[in-house]
Regions:
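Low-complexity, Gly/Ser/Thr/Pro-rich intrinsically disordered linker/tail segments
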Residues: 195, 204-222
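Solvent-exposed coil/turn segments that connect beta secondary-structure elements
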Residues: 108-112, 126, 133, 153, ...
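Single conserved hydrophobic/aromatic residue that forms the stacking wall/gate
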Residues: 1-9, 13
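Hydrophobic/aromatic-rich core segments of domains that either
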Residues: 93-127
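Secondary-structure boundary elements
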Residues: 11-49
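Cysteine-centered nucleophilic/redox motifs
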Residues: 52, 61-92, 185
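Proteins synthesized as precursors that undergo proteolytic processing into mature forms
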Residues: 149-203
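Second-shell loop/turn segments in exported
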Residues: 14-20, 55-62, 163-167, 177-179
Length: 222
């Protein structure tokens, strides 16, 4: 499941981003990890309460997707039938291009400062959301610490992935699924994606291989 709740387990890393020469101690991480539990959220109508005073609710993982979906709904309410919303990592297309063709959306090559895409996809009226370890990270003694954390350990997720891209109808869903699939790893992520209707994934591994769950969107490296 996707946990929106976080404690200072993630805040510890965020604070350390100011001083990239320091890694939180294991004792710090384990202490804060005790407060990571989505069951601490109580919802009553429009009221949301946390039963753990040391827990924090972090919606950063879905905020851009939520905003993108609202922007698309607004444009459609104004009878705009063609357009593209780009919030950086979240691309949401409205209908198809004015000439009737699909949009070409690039997926960034991890750690490439030039911004060149590693591949492109062809979509219309779809969301394309990417989560990757190259977005926010720092290195200490040659070791990379990224922002996607394993909620069972408190440390950055360890696997062979650099990024996960989700193609779906909803950008908010894409936000949640891209992070979740990254944490799950390729095999379990594929199982999840295959269980969902209208959702596909593109995985970029740490040797820059591209793995897809479908050929539907004409993934191209040219």
């Amino acid at each position: 499941s996707t946990h929106c709740i976080s404690s200072a387990a993630s805040d510890v890393y965020k604070r350390q981003e100011v001083d990239a020469s320091v890694v939180p101690s294991d004792a710090q991480i384990q202490s804060e990890l005790a407060h990571v539990n989505y069951r601490n959220i109580q919802i009553n109508g429009n009221d949301v309460m946390l039963t753990d005073s040391k827990a924090k609710l972090d919606l950063g993982g879905i905020a851009k997707g939520f905003i993108a979906d609202k922007m698309k709904a607004y444009l459609q309410s104004k009878k705009i039938s063609s357009g593209i919303i780009n919030l950086g990592g979240n691309v949401l297309t409205v209908g198809e291009k004015s000439d009737g063709s699909d949009y070409t959306v690039g997926i960034q090559k991890p750690f490439d400062e030039s911004g060149e895409p590693i591949c492109t996809v062809k979509v219309k009226d779809k969301s394309v959301v990417t989560s990757g370890i190259y977005e926010r990270y720092y290195r200490v003694d040659g070791k990379l610490y990224h922002h996607i954390l394993d909620t069972t350990t408190g440390y950055p997720v360890k696997n062979n992935l650099y990024s996960v891209t989700i193609i779906s109808d909803s950008s908010c869903d894409g936000d949640a699924l891209s992070t979740t699939c990254f944490a799950l790893g390729i095999d379990k992520a594929k199982e999840l994606i295959n269980s969902l209707s209208g959702v596909e994934a593109i995985f970029v591994t740490n040797d820059y291989s591209i793995i897809t769950t479908s050929d539907e969107y004409n993934v191209s490296t040219e």
